[in-house]
């Protein structure tokens, strides 16, 4: 069984901080329930069509450096609404042997 070292990630464009915090809390609860090791977490209030997002790049840097081997989000659209951007992120994870896990 693979031991997942997880970066929990939440994103929303809506200016509703409590909802964003709850989204992250849900991801972290599910990671804990599944027995994953939560290495780090972040949340960002950005549009899902934007690619140049500081929290996203911090998370990808952690993958590249081998600090995490899994990204956990509520759903795929939390990473991006743009299919090309989502593909780029998934290829990046694949290239570094990391996986994407959703709570849904």
Q: Where are the model-predicted features located?
A:
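Short, structured surface patches at the beginning of a domain
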Residues: 1-104
């Amino acid at each position: 069984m693979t031991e997942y070292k997880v970066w929990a990630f939440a994103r929303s464009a809506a200016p509703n901080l409590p909802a964003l915090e709850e989204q992250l809390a849900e991801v972290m609860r599910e990671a804990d329930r599944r027995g994953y090791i939560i290495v780090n977490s972040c949340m960002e209030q950005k549009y899902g069509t934007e690619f140049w997002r500081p929290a996203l790049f911090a998370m990808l840097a952690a993958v590249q450096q081998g600090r995490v081997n899994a990204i956990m989000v509520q759903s795929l659209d939390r990473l991006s609404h743009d299919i090309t951007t989502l593909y780029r992120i998934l290829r990046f994870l694949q290239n570094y042997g990391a996986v994407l896990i959703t709570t849904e």
